[in-house]
Structures are given as structure tokens and as C-alpha cells.
Amino acid sequence: MLSINLDDVMQVLTNVRSYLIAFGVVLALAIIVMVAVRKLPKAKKKMIRAQSGLAILLALTIVINLICTGPMSTMLDLVSGSGTINEETSAKATQLVNEITAEGVVLAKDEDNVLPMASGSKLNVFGWSSTNPCYGGTGSGALNTAYPVTDLLTGLHDAGIETNEELSKFYTDYKADRPSVGMVEQDWTLPEPNVNLYTDEMMENAKAFSDTAMVVITRVGGEGADLPTDMASVVDGSWIRRVAQAYGSERGTAYYNGTYDDSLNEGNDWDKGDHFLQLSNREEDLLDLVTSNFDNVILVYNGANAFQMDFLKDYPQIKGVLLCPGTGQSGFEGFGKVVSGEVNPSGRTADTYVSDLTAAPWWNNFGDFKYTNTEDLNSDASFFDPEGATPSFVNYVEGIYV
């Protein structure tokens, strides 16, 4: 579900500002009247003050009703469950999302005409993320599951591509849900099965099903926390302790509130110094397995953050690469149309995909850096900062935000 965002709260206050001002005027006038009659006879003063109090209550009632039936009407309907989005509006929104996705998918590589695949083709889709892809970001960019969601495999099926159901069941049986990455806390665990779980029979069945394989790699990131630059420290818990190490105090934000379950995939998902935007050990093993069994491999990177693609040079079997960020509620319909050739991919990269992210000049400059001499400006605990917040800064360098 959607997370609370301070900008959204401020927007609501802006929308109802005129109503609050009107009530404030009535309240001020009533208070002035109450003060002005203080020298009148007791009975008359009591009557006027009572009427002034009633006027305040009446004004408050009117203002609340005007707000609820005016600028807040749609929001209250949706929150209470009484509001609905009509079929026409929903259909238009779905069509727009599908068009945006279809036009935004980037064809980064296509050799030997591995893409597009004709409708009716069979495809082995590898990678746990194929059954749990990224649909959006975090905070206000999160997905609202109150409405139907089209997943990656459904998008392929609707485009006429038949996928290996044995592989899909293998992934959903392994883990049904994606670990949550949110604004307040982040579980960075990547549930990629250890390759020793792929049986010889499964791989033989896959090769008999199709000579083409797709591997899906996904990363989720967004508002509230930068992606970890040292996954090993997330695994051992020192990532959380960085607040104390860096600022000499436990007081900080939820910025480093990240965990990782390294036991899920039988351990050792990351080596020391590995960052979140590179292949994990399990993903490297998966690529080794797939490329040793298939000569026609399509890699799909599903994520909004530029991934480190230096590994592509090591796998000549990867002949196709598609970049597909979060697609929203139904955008994988558009993705399927790109794979099947119904839509010609026209997307272009908005970011630079470097072979080594750690060599970029901004690598050591982004973060959540705290002032150590601003105790008088610290804020108390809140929803956004459970441990309280300290004023922070960042040294801007070119490319840090793009």
C-alpha cells in the first residue's frame, strides 16, 4: 500500500487553506465579541458569549462539511471504501500505463535477431524476480494493490508467448512474496534460489521446451533510503550501526535501517565490498547455469536504478538486453508487446550505465551526513524518523542525482 509522504500532507493542507482561514476569521471575531462584552450586565454578557460559542461550533461544523464534500471528497471516499473508479476511467488509465511502458522499454542489445519473438513462441523465463518483479518505487511511488496488477509472465502470455510453467512454479514455491523495501525500513534480501536446487531433470525439460531463455534481474529502490554500497555490511548488521559510527550517536534517521536474510539462499549471497547494483553471487551462478545450457539468452533488467552491466562481456550467449523499470499496475502488458514485436521499442536510457559504479566521482559523496553541532535543532521521534532526526547535508557533485 501507499506510504505517507510529507509532501502529500502539505498538499492537503494547501487545498483546505481557504476553509481554515475562513474559520479562523469567524473564531477571531467571536473571541473579540466575547472580550468586548465583558463590562455588560451578567445576564446579557452570558447570552452573547453563549451565542458566540454556538457561532464558533456552527462555523466549525460548516467548514468541516465543506471540506469533506469539497477538496477532500474523493480522498475520503477512497479511504472509506465507498469511492469507486468507473470502468471508463480505469480503462483509460490502464491504456496509458501500457503505452508508457511499451514506449519506455529500452532495447539495449539485440544480436542474431533474438528479439522480437514471434507470437506463439515458447520461452524459458529464469530468475525468481520473473514471478515477483518491480512495479514501482517506495513512498508515493509504491504500488496500490487495491486494483488488479499485471505481472511480467501474464504480460508475456497476453502477447502470445508461452512460458515454462515448471520454472515459474519452482520460483513461487521457493518464496511467494518479495521482501519489502520501504521508507521506514528496508529488507534488501534477494530471494534467488541456489543453483543446486535446479535439478538435471528441470534443466533438461527446459531445453526440450525451448532453445531460448530469458533471465530477469530486479532491483527495488526509491524514496527514503539510498541503495546499500556494501551489501556485506547489511548482512552482518553493521549497516544499521553506521549511524553511531559516523555521527557518534545512535540518533539518526531510518536511512540505514536495512536488513538482509543471508540464510534464505543458503548463505554467501555477497562478497565484501559488493554493492546493491551489481550481480549477487546467486545471480552470477544463475547466469553461469543458463548460459551453459542455452545459446540464445535475453537479459531483462527490471529496476529504476542504473545497474552495473560489466558482466555482459563475459557472456556472449546473452544476445538480447531489455531495460524495463517499474511498470505500474498493468504496464507489463506493454512489455509483452515489445517482446513479441507488436510494439517497436523506442525507449532511450535516461541514465549512464557505467561498467564500474564505484569509479564514478559521486560514489563517495552521496549519503545521509549529519551535523554534529546542531543539538538544538534536532527533532523528536516521528513516523518518518522513529529515533528522531538530526539536520543533514550532502556535498553536491555533478551526477549525484541523475
Language model segments and positions:
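C-terminal non-catalytic regions of proteins with extracellular/luminal or membrane-system context
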Residues: M1-V402
